[in-house]
Amino acid sequence: MLFLLSELSGTLTPLNVFRYITFRTGGALFTAGFFVFWFGPWIISLLRLRQGKGQPIREDGPATHLTKRGTPTMGGLMILAGAVVSILLWTNPRNHYVWVTLAVTLGFGAIGFYDDYLKVTKQSHKGFSGRFRLLLEFAIAGAACLLISIYSPAGLQNQLAFPVFKDALLNLGWFWVPFAAFVIVGAGNAVNITDGLDGLAIVPVMIACGTFGVIAYLVGNSFTAGYLQVNYVRDTGELAVVCGAVIGAGLGFLWFNAPPAQIFMGDTGSLALGGLLGAIAVAAKHEIVLAIVGGLFVLEIMSVIIQVASFKLTGKRVFRMAPIHHHFEQKGWKEPQVVIRFWIIAVILALVGLATLKLR
């Protein structure tokens, strides 16, 4: 919204600053962070009052987790509120990619909210039907990908770009929309599964958002895209502002989610943030790079898939417990060790992902 002030720069020259993506990204980060930090205590108190027993804790999980009983969930509401307010304030309201990304984020957030609501009210780990949940996610992601395909440059519609290889594009044709929808749904559920320890998911999400904020900015600028020899995707630079807002909201949330957590993100936040990352990667034509940058999330969801498949096929478990962060807890790692070491992995993978921009 503030972007529109730049149109008055002919009369008031200082207003031209609102034209710059870098300035608005910084503004979005600060605004979202301040919003969550300021309203966080009130939201936590309200959720604690409404939820009573809070998020149910797995009885078969690590014994140390039993002390977390009574901690409220749905903290994703804090993140989404701060991020959305900031995004609406600082982005260009005429940008299609911003609205599509917001739709995915809020749609996935609504699904996660309902799932959290059922878990809290029933005091059970089972929300609503997994198949129905996936159906809703694919419906939202499919519609978003169809719009992204329409808004994409003519030469890049339905194309899958490969990192490192110059001008390497694979025309997926009609299959691109379901493929891209799978990327978004997969990202949403991968982040959702990662969110099992205090601070474990939110920091890698912020790292991934920072990385894709840079990627979106570079591929959305014709000069930098040409210099790096990557595909120029017009208007995606505005998604850097979205990433800035999410990072700010994430920092505000981390203040309250740092161990011992005062609130959990819940499916409300994790599903929404994962969907957001997937949507940005799809819009910027860097779907494969998302698997690198978000490699930690891939590892987490693959550990669950492997565990379930192995048990059904052989009756044996590969890991002591899945997702894999619980496996390391069962091996004797303390929760802070698991969290910080996984953060380190996330930073390394983000750097590798950024390096693919230069390697051509």
UniProtKB/Swiss-Prot annotation:
InterPro entries from the UniProt entry: Glycosyl_transferase_4, PNAcMuramoyl-5peptid_Trfase, PNAcMuramoyl-5peptid_Trfase_CS
Keyword vocabulary terms for this entry: Cell cycle, Cell division, Cell inner membrane, Cell membrane, Cell shape, Cell wall biogenesis/degradation, Magnesium, Membrane, Metal-binding, Peptidoglycan synthesis, Transferase, Transmembrane, Transmembrane helix
Subcellular locations according to the entry: Cell inner membrane
Tagged with keyword Metal-binding: yes
Top-level taxon: Bacteria
One Gene Ontology CC term in the entry: plasma membrane
Cofactors demanded by this protein: Mg(2+)
One GO MF term attached to the UniProt entry: metal ion binding
Pathway entry: Cell wall biogenesis; peptidoglycan biosynthesis
NCBIfam families xrefs: mraY
Protein name: Phospho-N-acetylmuramoyl-pentapeptide-transferase
Organism: Methylorubrum populi (strain ATCC BAA-705 / NCIMB 13946 / BJ001)
Gene it is expressed from: mraY
